[in-house]
Amino acid sequence: MDIALMAMKKLRAEGKLDDMEVSDEINACSIVVPVEIDHEDGKGPVMEEWLVFFKNETHNHPTEIEPFGGAATCLGGAIRDPLSGRGYVYQAMRVTGAADPTKSLKETLEGKLPQRKIVTGAASGYSSYGNQIGLATGLVDEIYHPNLSLIHISEPTRPISI
């Protein structure tokens, strides 16, 4: 999320993100959007300012230790904050990273779970939680690199909500 926030702050300083909400939040970014609302009073449509949240959550360590539960609670944590702010979470994306999951189990680092177990368990945990609450996941991508053998990267799980 730091990469995204740094880019947003730079663009805002350059005057290119006038619709970005300025806050102390470090795990999310929000933009202000005008929304036309038909009120029940019959006075016709009214324009209101709403926030679109882009929320990030990481659960690298929990996912590395217990992949299913770590990834499930990652998604749960990512939706918790928008919901507590009276938001509505309507989709998520999952971009994660790991070392080569096709490596032999003999190549697993001592004291670590095999990459294959982490990758498959995390994918199952994430999809299980999302399916149980009815959250659509529009993007799932897994990046493999040898340097990721020390930890499973579960950043970002980013629900998009309003």
Task: Describe each PLM feature range.
Residues 60, 74, 159-160:
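A generic structural micro-environment signature
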Residues 61-67:
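A short glycine/serine-rich beta->alpha loop
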Residues 69, 73-76, 80-152:
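A glycine-rich phosphate/pyrophosphate-binding beta-strand-loop-alpha-helix module
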